[in-house]
Amino acid sequence: MDIRAAEISKVIKDQIANFGTEAQVSEVGSVLSVGDGIARIHGLDNVQAGEMVEFANGVQGMALNLEADNVGVVIFGSDAEIKEGDNVKRTETIVDVPVGKALLGRVVDALGNPIDGKGPIETTERRRVELKAPGIIPRKSVDEPVQSGLKAIDALVPVGRGQRELIIGDRQTGKTAVAIDTFINQKTVNESDDESKKLYCVYVAVGQKRSTVAQIVKSLEENGAMEYSIVVAATASEPAPLQYLAPYTGCAMGEFFRDNGMHAVIVYDDLSKQAVAYRQMSLLLRRPPGREAYPGDVFYLHSRLLERAAKMNDDNGGGSLTALPIIETQAGDVSAYIPTNVISITDGQIFLETDLFYQGVRPAINVGLSVSRVGGAAQTKAMKKVSGSIKLELAQYREMAAFAQFGSDLDASTQKLLNRGARLTELLKQPQFSPMPFEEQTVSIFAGTNGYIDDVAVDRVTEYESQMLSFMRSEHADILKTIRDTGKFEDDTKAATVAALDAFAKQFA
């Protein structure tokens, strides 16, 4: 075989010229110790706080404690496969998650990976889970309502788009039910073509049983609400770091809508469990404990999350993110550490009580303790007009009911007040998964406050309401349409409603 020196030298020169010097450079450290979901790592000198790191077996973690000689990392997965001396490499990215409309209708974990078995999620955008809340200048005061479909809320503690309204109560008082009904009630606005009316929903489940989350997803699907909802689940069986992260993940997904001129509502169910997960992580990272063994920055944990809910002004797209955090109390103790923290951060609270729940008042809202500090400005004019007196009447009723237990000979005005109060309480009851359109709520509450149910037996109030509303829908649909389209309850509408209710009173017996 003929060997030509010139040819060989040309091949060698070509190879030298095209020699690739790109080596994969990544900063690598080694595990000093691992246990209880925490790894101590040596050698990651340039790691950032909140940065993702990757262990040799592919499990990810997040650097939280940056100390002089080592880094404390919380592990997003099982620590069983990680051992001392293993390599750990930096990813050089702060924890981020996929965001966008492709997530609607899906169930994801705290890192944004799908867990519903419907294949991968095609998103183009990612967003950091921890971002600064909008400043004061880009914000605008709350002025549009979030219709929950629950009479007790829309009339007495109205919620506006961009508000933070706490739902607080003991276990098994229907806190999640209030949130899910609010989601289901957005079905009609989300079916319209007007993007500015739509309200996308994000539900974050923290530390709940998987069966409970599956049940919630099933309820949303059956009621047609899943197609405009995202569910983020960090269940009880998952590591504490994922339970701590899940609310921030859901918030980042909700912020996508807020920052693109759309509207979203997010439910954190519940923040008590997030605080417990954060306490576990902090104690294992050897951070000093404070009150109830929570770390010193547990207030900041929740405030930086809830401050991200905002109504943006028109220069910034006019979008909004409404937050409905849920807190579970122990035996009605709202003065415990976490409940008082979250009450002071939010713009009002909806207080649910066990006693009311067992008396059959559902939703079990304590109207006296529940407030909405900014929602009044967002309430529709029609609802504001008819519900003005109901709060006062219910407050007087509760005060009188306490005294009425002692004396039997009550004067006529007190008797009237007690009768009206009992019927109004009955009127505010509502079964689960049956939110009511606001125009029907308006007529219903108008009937209650104007004496139309005073002569109806208490146990027939619900029957009266359902028959009256079906009468209005069939005979006086124009009244309902006027209220729905204008959002107002003008004198002519009022006169027509009075005439309709008088006509119905004759046939209801």
Curated annotation (Swiss-Prot):
Q: What is its EC number?
A: 7.1.2.2
Which top EC class applies here? translocase
Where's it found, cell-wise? Cell inner membrane
Q: Site feature Required for activity: at which residues?
A: 370
The terms describing its cellular component in GO are: plasma membrane; proton-transporting ATP synthase complex
Q: Tell me the disulfide pairings in this chain.
A: none
Classify the protein's membrane topology as the record does: Peripheral membrane protein
Print the keywords alphabetically. Answer: ATP synthesis, ATP-binding, Cell inner membrane, Cell membrane, CF(1), Hydrogen ion transport, Ion transport, Membrane, Nucleotide-binding, Translocase, Transport
Q: Which Pfam families match?
A: ATP-synt_ab (PF00006), ATP-synt_ab_C (PF00306), ATP-synt_ab_N (PF02874)
Q: What reactions does this protein catalyze?
A: ATP + H2O + 4 H(+)(in) = ADP + phosphate + 5 H(+)(out)
Give the matching PROSITE patterns. ATPASE_ALPHA_BETA
GO molecular-function annotation terms? Answer: ADP binding; ATP binding; proton-transporting ATP synthase activity, rotational mechanism
* Residues the entry annotates as binding ATP: 169-176
Family of the protein in this entry: Belongs to the ATPase alpha/beta chains family.
Its assembly, as annotated, is: F-type ATPases have 2 components, CF(1) - the catalytic core - and CF(0) - the membrane proton channel. CF(1) has five subunits: alpha(3), beta(3), gamma(1), delta(1), epsilon(1). CF(0) has four main subunits: a(1), b(1), b'(1) and c(9-12).
Query: What is the role of the protein in this entry?
Result: Produces ATP from ADP in the presence of a proton gradient across the membrane. The alpha chain is a regulatory subunit.
Q: Which PANTHER family did the record assign?
A: ATP SYNTHASE SUBUNIT ALPHA, MITOCHONDRIAL (PTHR48082:SF2)
What is the designated name of this protein?
Answer: ATP synthase subunit alpha
| Lineage, uppermost ranks | Bacteria, Pseudomonadati, Pseudomonadota, Alphaproteobacteria, Sphingomonadales
What gene, per UniProt, encodes this protein? atpA
